[in-house]
Amino acid sequence: MWLKIYLLSILAISVFTFVFLFGALPQFEDTAVWKFRKWLSNRPAAIRSWDSKYCGGRLSVVGDFCGSVVAPAAPWSVPILYCAFTTYMFSAYYEDLHPFIAENHWYYAWLAPVAYTILVVSFVLATFSDPGKITKQNHALLLNQFRFDNLMFLEDTECSTCKFTKPARSKHDRFTNKCVAKFDHYCLWINNTVGLYNYRWFLFFLLGNVWTLCWGALLAGLKMIVMVAAEYKDHPKPLPSIFSQWWQVMITNENKRVGIIFLLSVSTGALACAFTAMHFYYIYLGATTNETDKWGDIHAAISEGSVWMFQKPGFKLDRSILLQKDEEGRPNRSLTAEEREYVAQNGLALTLLTDHKPIVNIYDKGFLNNLKAVMFPNSAY
């Protein structure tokens, strides 16, 4: 019974995680995944609206109060939960799997200590390293770290909280209340922002989890094969399906821990692999998670027919100069002096943009260079 509840819970968590991770990608635009993510994102506002209409905002007041009480400890609850989960997995491995592996597959015995070391080191680095906090001391240097593309990041935009000009690709993180250079996202699992300086450690952390969960599934699977073979050695034919054989072995009391290790490793390992692949895809695109969301907004505006771009047939652009017009044809901004000079020198004309492909991402330097920039960020200190 509990195993079925666990499997259903994992399935539900996997669906919601997939929707939130990938639903904003341009490839899913106007699909059921994209629409479901948008619907979920609007639920908090819808609940507050319902509360305001029918309960006079009382539920929101209670919720805000409860949030203020648990807020100081809440950020660390997920990392603590992660550490507890990891500790349980390794203790279960050494009690139920390691003797079998050491006796029958000794060449795999080194995997556990190596994986545990990688997890601990990567978790500490990702959790406690500086993501690229922008301060008065390093602001001038970080301001010149990246060019302004005037698409997602406009010049002379001030952070309303920190009261200084926002460097390109930066964002004020509302969870940690600080501006972060090359902001990617805030990660609950490490209770830290992922940015310019610690993105490499975050990747290290992801790869460490992928490594651990994959070998966990492999080693638990090796023992499951032996247990299933022993259980059905003298079983009358025809034998049940492979799935039924594995399921029956996993739900017996003496095999439950091995079954749990296998199921946890496979289910969470699939999510870890998908999440890691997504981040390498972002590196390939030359974009952060935050910027991918912004690109989604640009694609939506193009679909609405409100985006115009300076271009010329046959001319290869090295930057994109875009304007968004309202219903009355008024542009959202004025061109900078540098943009006006670029348009005049190359004889570019303002035309309606019907496809996102002509847009140049100035931050994309090719996959290898993008990866190099992630692994070896230029220090601003």
Curated annotation (Swiss-Prot):
The active site is at 187 (s-palmitoyl cysteine intermediate). Its main location: endoplasmic reticulum. The chain crosses the membrane at residues 5-25, 65-85, 108-128, 202-222, 258-278. Keywords: Acyltransferase, Endoplasmic reticulum, Lipoprotein, Membrane, Palmitate, Transferase, Transmembrane, Transmembrane helix. It is found in: Endoplasmic reticulum membrane. InterPro entries: Palmitoyltrfase_DHHC, PFA4/ZDH16/20/ERF2-like. It comes from the Eukaryota. It is a multi-pass membrane protein. Its EC number is 2.3.1.225. GO terms for biological process: protein targeting to membrane. Residues 26-64, 129-201, 279-381 are cytoplasmic. Residues 157-207 form the DHHC domain. GO terms for cellular component: endoplasmic reticulum; endoplasmic reticulum membrane; Golgi apparatus. One of its GO terms (molecular function) is protein-cysteine S-palmitoyltransferase activity. It catalyses: L-cysteinyl-[protein] + hexadecanoyl-CoA = S-hexadecanoyl-L-cysteinyl-[protein] + CoA. Residues 1-4, 86-107, 223-257 are lumenal. It is an enzyme of class 2 (transferase). Belongs to the DHHC palmitoyltransferase family. SWF1 subfamily. Palmitoyltransferase that targets several endosomal SNAREs. Palmitoylates the SNAREs at cysteine residues close to the cytoplasmic end of their transmembrane domain. May have a role in the cellular quality control of transmembrane domain-containing proteins. The DHHC domain is required for palmitoyltransferase activity. This is Palmitoyltransferase SWF1. The lineage of its organism: Eukaryota, Fungi, Dikarya, Ascomycota, Saccharomycotina. The gene is SWF1.
